[in-house]
């Protein structure tokens, strides 16, 4: 009924469409995994049910809340309404400090305690790496 050229054209278009759909799917999956979405301590406190999935908690490191004990770091993240205690094992980023923004990735023990597996320190829009600042200062 249809000629050989029409069948080949249909197969070619079907393969292109399948490739485009697969590419879009893979890009969206990649973006979903890399988007840095986090919940504030207030959002954590308002949770009805705690799940066992890995989540991110973000806010400011409360002043005078950092306690370093050998390989563990304990600190408090606040959104100035509520607070959550964080326990992290490992080295913290260079930008990690009291009064600075931070995102902790890990698991909730309960609505007040969080075990972090990764710490991401945030910086403001004026941040400049020391090497760049030094290079610009010389000129």
From Swiss-Prot:
Residues 1-9 are cytoplasmic. This is Cytochrome c-type biogenesis protein CcmE. It comes from the Bacteria. It is found in: Cell inner membrane. Belongs to the CcmE/CycJ family. One of its GO terms (molecular function) is heme binding. Heme chaperone required for the biogenesis of c-type cytochromes. Transiently binds heme delivered by CcmC and transfers the heme to apo-cytochromes in a process facilitated by CcmF and CcmH. It is a single-pass type II membrane protein. It comes from Pelagibacter ubique (strain HTCC1062). GO terms for cellular component: plasma membrane. Its main location: membrane. The chain crosses the membrane at residues 10-30. InterPro entries: CcmE (IPR004329), CcmE-like_sf (IPR036127), NA-bd_OB-fold (IPR012340). One of its GO terms (biological process) is cytochrome complex assembly. Residues 31-139 are periplasmic. It holds the Pfam family CcmE. Keywords: Cell inner membrane, Cell membrane, Cytochrome c-type biogenesis, Heme, Iron, Membrane, Metal-binding, Signal-anchor, Transmembrane, Transmembrane helix. Heme binds at residues 123, 127.
């Amino acid at each position: 009924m249809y000629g050989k050229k029409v069948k080949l054209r249909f197969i070619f278009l079907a393969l292109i469409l399948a490739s485009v759909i697969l590419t879009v799917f893979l890009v969206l999956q990649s973006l979903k995994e890399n988007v840095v979405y986090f919940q504030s301590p207030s959002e954590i406190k308002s949770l009805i049910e705690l799940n066992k999935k890995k989540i991110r908690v973000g806010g400011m490191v409360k002043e005078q809340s950092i306690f370093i004990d050998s390989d563990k770091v304990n600190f408090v993240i606040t959104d100035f309404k509520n607070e959550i205690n964080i326990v992290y094992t490992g080295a913290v980023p260079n930008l990690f400090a009291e009064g600075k923004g931070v995102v902790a990735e890990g698991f909730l023990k309960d609505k007040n305690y969080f075990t972090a597996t990764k710490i991401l320190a945030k910086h403001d829009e004026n941040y400049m790496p020391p090497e760049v600042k030094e290079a610009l200062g010389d000129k």
